[in-house]
Amino acid sequence: SVQSLVRRLDRFRPDDFRLIICDEAHHAAARTYRAIFDYFRPEKLIGFTATPNRGDKVRLDTVFQDIIFQRDLRWGIQNGYLCDIHCRRVNIGFDLSAVHTRHGDYAPGELDEAMEGTADAIAQAYREMAVGATLIFAVSVHQAEEIARRISGAVVVTANTKDRASIIQAFTAGEIPCIVNCMVFTEGTDIPRVETVIVARPTQSETLYAQMVGRGLRLYPGKER
C-alpha cells in the first residue's frame, strides 16, 4: 500500500524505477503520495483516475504535467461501455443548513445527526423505486444498520466486515437483494450486478458522487440501465 511504501522508502534508491504508475490518481496530491513521488526519479510518472476532481480543490497539475488521454461518463455511456442512467430525486425531509463543511465535504458527525430519522423514508424509496440488485450508500455505520433493519434481506457492509468477498458473491448470485454500505464501495469496487444505487449519503464532492453513482454503471447481462 501507499502507507507501507512511505515507511520503507529507505529500502530503495531514487532511481530504482524508470516508470511509476499511479491508480486512483486523484489521490496523487495527498501528502503520502507526494512523499513517494518526490523521493523517486522515474523517467515517467503516469496516473489513471475516473474522477480527477478532488473535493479539496487541490489541482492534479501539481503532480502531473499533461493529460494524454481523457474519457468521461457521458462518452462511456454513449459508446456502450457503461449503462445508461435513469435518475430520480427523492425528498426525504432532512435539513443540511446547520452542517459545516470540512475538507471540501460535509462534516461526518454533523451529517450523521442531520440524517437521523431518515431510515424509514430511505427504505420506503427502496421498496417503491429500486430495480434489481441494489447498493445503498449510508452516512455512518449506525445509519446503515437502521436502513438495513427496514429492508428484507438487506446486508450491511462496513470497513470492519470480514466476509466482504462472500457477501459480494452472494449479492452477485442474487441471494442478497440489497447491500447497505458506509464508505466502503466508493473506490476499487467491481460489482457489475448492481442495478440501482441509492445515495443516502449527501455530499458536496463531485468525485465522491461520481464514484457512488458509478458503482451502478458497469455492464451486466440483462441489465439495461
Segments and roles (model prediction):
Residues 202-211, 215-225:
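Conserved segment of the helicase C-terminal RecA-like domain
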Residues 1-19, 30-35:
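Conserved helix/coil segment N-terminal to the catalytic DExD/H
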Residues 19, 26-87:
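Post-DEXD/H (motif II) to motif III coupling segment of the RecA-like Helicase ATP-binding lobe
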Residues 1, 43-50, 178-181:
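Structural recognition of the conserved hydrophobic beta-strand(s) that form the central parallel beta-sheet
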Residues 135, 143-147, 153-187:
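Conserved helicase ATPase core of P-loop NTP-dependent helicases/translocases
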Residues 67-135:
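Conserved interdomain linker/interface between the two RecA-like ATPase lobes of SF2 helicase motors
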Residues 7-11, 80, 179-197, 213-218:
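SF2 helicase motor core recognition
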Residues 20, 24-26, 144, 185, ...:
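Conserved Walker B
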